[in-house]
């Protein structure tokens, strides 16, 4: 039967509950257990799909097309389980489900209330996400004390009663701040956070105490005494140089052993050799390169979280330190392309809206004319097509209908219909809702032989995740190909262009999908590894090597 680990956070937000949960899951997986993780978000949005990246960070897309919290990206990067829409739900989804049931009469005339109807729906979602696994780690978003989190905390309190101590475990993540004026670490915020949790009816079994410096044993004993937690279950989590070292650090403090003992799990010893190799590759690069990432959300690091991590993964698998130079696309519009000088490669990521679009197009032009390795992702492919159409194919005024509906040459246009993986047809128009109406999730793409794309992946058909509603306009296909653009990947039905490249360029590749969502530190991703190899070749003054696979 599935065992449940509930992870809450206190004192302040952004303590790293997702990293802590992912790291523990990685250790348990390394001990031979089948694990999954689920994120419960207290906001009323149905999903983060329409939320600003400045507020929420990136939207992570699962294989089955769910738009989710970026923590699911951490989950997939740390464990081999593929997450889906069952692994993420929000207050908005819970209330939507309950109201739908009430309208159908499923509550038989009862007064619908937070308890039991909302809490029962939360528990149903948790159990559904955990089916078939040895251990399910459930992360509760927000901070203990927030009014929004109360229904979720009440639901997991009830689950502890239902499951008992041998099938459920509470881990509470807190902050132990250092007060420089006093020269001391302060445990009082942790004590009050646990007190707040206990007033709800939850007694944590384990505390993970975040700090920017080592926490003395005396302070851990003090925390244990005032929070009613066993002393060996007070885990100090000190800031690490890389998140991929955290599984080993938590294992050294026997966090997994405490979990195995309390839940009476049948687990072997942990084999963390893969994580040791990852950290070793990060610590001992053979070369460094600088990649310019030209976007519109670069002042908020979480907006491109998976993309930044994918470049780190490529560095791991090519023994290269990848330094990312974040460049605001509006800066290029205002001050020119000087910020791109000296970089070894240029990447333009996905995005929405007209702001900064001409800066991205200018970055593509710089990469093409200066023969700098270029990788375009989603919107990065669209601006590559626009730039090529304007400046190589001579289509003056070429644009996307997303930004200029009256463009004389709409080389990028709204997808009005497409075939899903299940074989059905999806239809969209300009009047469709913004939320949940894009081409989402894993889609197959057929690669053209003898292209850079095919050499990079080393296979004929790939599956990558999508999140877009605009596409290459096939009416301009022949014109652009005649001018030298190469279409190197299409949807299986041949109707949607998925990858383009410029054969005359040392390394110029753009894709409509988001390869960063499937990159992992242990497995890498062939597209990013090929991109970083091309950056290394430029840095070393050599020709890019023949691409092929994620491994060095």
From Swiss-Prot:
GO terms for cellular component: cytosol. Keywords: ATP-binding, Glutamine amidotransferase, Ligase, Magnesium, Metal-binding, Nucleotide-binding, Pyrimidine biosynthesis. It comes from the Bacteria. It holds the Pfam family GATase. Residues 1-265 are annotated as: Amidoligase domain. Its EC number is 6.3.4.2. GO terms for biological process: 'de novo' CTP biosynthetic process; pyrimidine nucleobase biosynthetic process. L-glutamine binds at residues 351, 379-382, 402, 469. CTP binds at residues 13, 146-148, 186-191, 222. Pathway: Pyrimidine metabolism; CTP biosynthesis via de novo pathway; CTP from UDP: step 2/2. Residues 290-541 form the Glutamine amidotransferase type-1 domain. It is an enzyme of class 6 (ligase). Allosterically activated by GTP, when glutamine is the substrate; GTP has no effect on the reaction when ammonia is the substrate. The allosteric effector GTP functions by stabilizing the protein conformation that binds the tetrahedral intermediate(s) formed during glutamine hydrolysis. Inhibited by the product CTP, via allosteric rather than competitive inhibition. UTP binds at residues 13, 186-191, 222. It catalyses: UTP + L-glutamine + ATP + H2O = CTP + L-glutamate + ADP + phosphate + 2 H(+); L-glutamine + H2O = L-glutamate + NH4(+); UTP + NH4(+) + ATP = CTP + ADP + phosphate + 2 H(+). GO terms for molecular function: ATP binding; CTP synthase activity; glutaminase activity; identical protein binding; metal ion binding. The active site is at 378 (nucleophile), 514, 516. ATP binds at residues 14-19, 71. Homotetramer. NCBIfam families: PRK05380.1, PyrG. Catalyzes the ATP-dependent amination of UTP to CTP with either L-glutamine or ammonia as the source of nitrogen. Regulates intracellular CTP levels through interactions with the four ribonucleotide triphosphates. Belongs to the CTP synthase family. This is CTP synthase. The lineage of its organism: Bacteria, Pseudomonadati, Pseudomonadota, Gammaproteobacteria, Methylococcales.
